[in-house]
């Protein structure tokens, strides 16, 4: 009998108390209709930055001529990936912090790499001291054929960055990015990633419901 494939939900919960980048629009919800004698349904209206919670950035986020998230091909967001632990490493995740999971004695590197930096991701507060990717780390991953990088913090760049150097590497190398992943319970290793963005035709990012499955 086939062993069931284990599933990890690596998405942050989204609600009014979800952390938000300073200046971004937090999550809010208003009820437009509620079930009652004259109404058979509940209907709400949502307002939020598309960067609240676990999300995929579109090229438009860091390139004025970049594609919207609705125009980004989906292939990078589904497929084999490797989760690498760099817990407590920062402010920048350097190559030496992830090299232990990339050695010649390991299986071939999948095209998607997710890095865990938190022991426990802060789901109820903004972390201005978040860990980010060193730009050279992304360059070297791209050289190895990686098409998507992810991290369990709110940005692949430091929170106070004005140049967004790692985002500019993503732009130049044509990579995709996932941010605000929840990797607290996920062991290092290889998985199948499924994290599809919504087809928002004018947006600079999209929420995703990101999950990992053990390989078939």
Curated annotation (Swiss-Prot):
Q: List the InterPro entries hit by this protein, alphabetically.
A: KFase/CYL, KFase_sf, Kynurenine_formamidase_bac
Give the co-factor note: Binds 2 zinc ions per subunit.
- The residues listed in the UniProt record as binding Zn(2+) 2, with positions renumbered to this chain, are 57, 167, 179
**Recorded metabolic or biological pathway in which this protein acts:** Amino-acid degradation; L-tryptophan degradation via kynurenine pathway; L-kynurenine from L-tryptophan: step 2/2
Q: What are this entry's molecular-function GO terms?
A: arylformamidase activity; formamidase activity; zinc ion binding
Q: What's the top EC group for this one?
A: hydrolase
Binding positions for substrate per the UniProt entry: 21
The record's EC number reads 3.5.1.9
Q: Which residues cross the membrane?
A: none
Name the coenzymes or cofactors required: Zn(2+)
The record lists the catalysed reaction(s) as:
N-formyl-L-kynurenine + H2O = L-kynurenine + formate + H(+)
List the residue ranges forming a coiled coil, or say none: none
State the Gene Ontology BP annotations.
Answer: anthranilate metabolic process; L-tryptophan catabolic process to kynurenine
Active site: residue positions: 61 (proton donor/acceptor)
Q: Which UniProt keywords apply?
A: Hydrolase, Metal-binding, Tryptophan catabolism, Zinc
NCBIfam families xref list: trp_arylform (TIGR03035)
Subunit details? Homodimer.
Family, per entry: Belongs to the Cyclase 1 superfamily. KynB family.
Name of the protein: Kynurenine formamidase
Source species, please?
Answer: Paracidovorax citrulli (strain AAC00-1) (Acidovorax citrulli)
